[in-house]
Amino acid sequence: MPTPSMEDYLERIYLLIEEKGYARVSDIAEALEVHPSSVTKMVQKLDKSDYLVYERYRGLILTAKGKKIGKRLVYRHDLLEDFLKMIGVDSDHIYEDVEGIEHHLSWDAIDRIGDLVQYFQEDPSRLNDLREVQKKNEE
């Protein structure tokens, strides 16, 4: 199981490859706002853990294992953003809130949040009911 730091790298690498078709150390460093040497160290760890294949000066590719977890991490992040928006969290705080909680939730909790998002999406009146409760609580 990857550490939270490994998850951050895998998520970003997955997104870069989806967006650009590749991910270089410099791209990862820029996206995560870290020094390239830190990226190189982490990429080597991810290589040893079979999440990716890294060839110095040539780049990296995600293994099937790396792609699977990367896709799941992106799903988790997006789901949590959607959920926080849905329940009315201020958009200025959503990214930081997601970053703060995503590594601390079990996959079971993520699945239950997914169920709740689906529950609200299937019947918009449920979300309206939530808004009414929130209005009452703000008074």
UniProtKB/Swiss-Prot annotation:
Mn(2+) 1 binds at D8, E99, E102, H103. One of its GO terms (cellular component) is cytoplasm. Its main location: cytoplasm. Homodimer. One of its GO terms (molecular function) is DNA binding. InterPro entries: DtxR_MntR_Metal-Reg, Fe_dep_repressor, Fe_dep_repressor_sf, HTH_DTXR, HTH_tscrpt_reg_MntR, Iron_dep_repressor, WH-like_DNA-bd_sf, WH_DNA-bd_sf. The keyword Transcription regulation applies. SMART domains: HTH_DTXR. It is found in: Cytoplasm. Residues 1-63 form the HTH dtxR-type domain. GO terms for biological process: intracellular manganese ion homeostasis. Keywords: Activator, Cytoplasm, DNA-binding, Manganese, Metal-binding, Repressor, Transcription, Transcription regulation. This is HTH-type transcriptional regulator MntR.
